[in-house]
Amino acid sequence: MKTKLNIYNMQLLLFVFLVWDPARLVLANIQEDEAKNNITIFTRILDRLLDGYDNRLRPGLGDSITEVFTNIYVTSFGPVSDTDMEYTIDVFFRQKWKDERLKFKGPMNILRLNNLMASKIWTPDTFFHNGKKSVAHNMTMPNKLLRIQDDGTLLYTMRLTVQAECPMHLEDFPMDAHSCPLKFGSYAYTTSEVTYIWTYNASDSVQVAPDGSRLNQYDLLGQSIGKETIKSSTGEYTVMTAHFHLKRKIGYFVIQTYLPCIMTVILSQVSFWLNRESVPARTVFGVTTVLTMTTLSISARNSLPKVAYATAMDWFIAVCYAFVFSALIEFATVNYFTKRGWAWDGKSVVNDKKKEKASVMIQNNAYAVAVANYAPNLSKDPVLSTISKSATTPEPNKKPENKPAEAKKTFNSVSKIDRMSRIVFPVLFGTFNLVYWATYLNREPVLGVSP
């Protein structure tokens, strides 16, 4: 029984092998022939499309305006240079238009081609108005894509890296916001020949990759699109504009500038708590803090272009500098009045000593005169002489010595100016910080859209 079953299985396998394998070979040959036929068909289609095609002439020449639909996909945005007022952007730049001369009929609705075909047909002469430098990537092959639909609609995509100008208004720096434009349009064709249209709405015509931001000092808030017409001596041209809205991050500047300035001002106010006779210590505090503020103000300006107006950081540094310099002037004032106090104390002590010596001399002179006048009478009378000899010589009444006031009490006393400064300076500086930060941090970012 088992032997019969094995024989049956072997016969079945043999039958499948003899029948299926030739069928598979025939099917493979048919598919290969179809592929060869498709290649032949598409080659003929391309040859027919290019036969008599003049890529020097735009589509619809003399009949209609060529409409070019555009959209942008941003793969990388940044960095942004404040000193040069420019930014770098890496994009897939897509353009779509219709060319009736490229209609075809075939087994496929879309022909997917590379850059070689793009050089043989008419393409828009798009350029970037505010671009300083533009690079078309060519590694390992030119990064270009061309698709032709059977109705003559073409999609032309290329990868570009553009360095574009970004006008900045730095009055609110570093709490500022900017709108960096990307402007492009036709170089040779006026609005009566070629016009540009955004393919989708504002959010879809310009898209940024989720991980496309390359910004360390900015947040990319979003983007907007627009369209305008400019006039020149050669005619009117369509200009497409995409604005990228940026808000600066303040964290770096808080650590680099604001905190050092605040700590320097606080350090300058420590001198109010030192004795006013500590001239070297208070001088070191004043001079060191002034020099520190000067260094901070210079370093803060190095990361900015040389603008003719003051920024928000400049105002903060200027006020901090004024507080530090005022602390030094306060010490000079206290020291000046301290020296005058020494002179007054010295004069009072000297005058008291002179008056004391003069009173003693007057008393001694009076006593000497009295003795000289009455001495002869006492010598003639023996009784009086005896009494005078036995009597003790009267001494002038001595007044208690007036000890001069110790100068140390006047010199070591705390100055009224220091007492006032300990309260006034911190209160004023705290009020300034409260007003400054409340004003700038609560202000809505003003995105200036440049024309």
From Swiss-Prot:
It comes from the Eukaryota. Activated by pentobarbital. Inhibited by the antagonist bicuculline. It is a multi-pass membrane protein. This is Gamma-aminobutyric acid receptor subunit alpha-2. Belongs to the ligand-gated ion channel (TC 1.A.9) family. Gamma-aminobutyric acid receptor (TC 1.A.9.5) subfamily. GABRA2 sub-subfamily. Alpha subunit of the heteropentameric ligand-gated chloride channel gated by gamma-aminobutyric acid (GABA), a major inhibitory neurotransmitter in the brain. GABA-gated chloride channels, also named GABA(A) receptors (GABAAR), consist of five subunits arranged around a central pore and contain GABA active binding site(s) located at the alpha and beta subunit interface(s). When activated by GABA, GABAARs selectively allow the flow of chloride anions across the cell membrane down their electrochemical gradient. Keywords: Cell membrane, Cell projection, Chloride, Chloride channel, Cytoplasmic vesicle, Disulfide bond, Glycoprotein, Ion channel, Ion transport, Ligand-gated ion channel, Membrane, Postsynaptic cell membrane, Receptor, Signal, Synapse, Transmembrane, Transmembrane helix, Transport. CDD domains: LGIC_ECD_GABAAR_A2, LGIC_TM_GABAAR_alpha. It catalyses: chloride(in) = chloride(out). Heteropentamer, formed by a combination of alpha (GABRA1-6), beta (GABRB1-3), gamma (GABRG1-3), delta (GABRD), epsilon (GABRE), rho (GABRR1-3), pi (GABRP) and theta (GABRQ) subunits, each subunit exhibiting distinct physiological and pharmacological properties. Interacts with UBQLN1. Interacts with KIF21B. Interacts with LHFPL4. Interacts with SHISA7; interaction leads to the regulation of GABA(A) receptor trafficking, channel deactivation kinetics and pharmacology. Residues 1-28 form the signal peptide. 4-aminobutanoate binds at residues 94, 157. Glycans are attached at residues 38, 138. The extracellular domain contributes to synaptic contact formation. The GABA-binding pockets are located at the interface between neighboring alpha and beta subunits. One of its GO terms (cellular component) is chloride channel complex. The chain crosses the membrane at residues 250-270, 281-300, 312-332, 421-441. Disulfide bonds join 166-180.
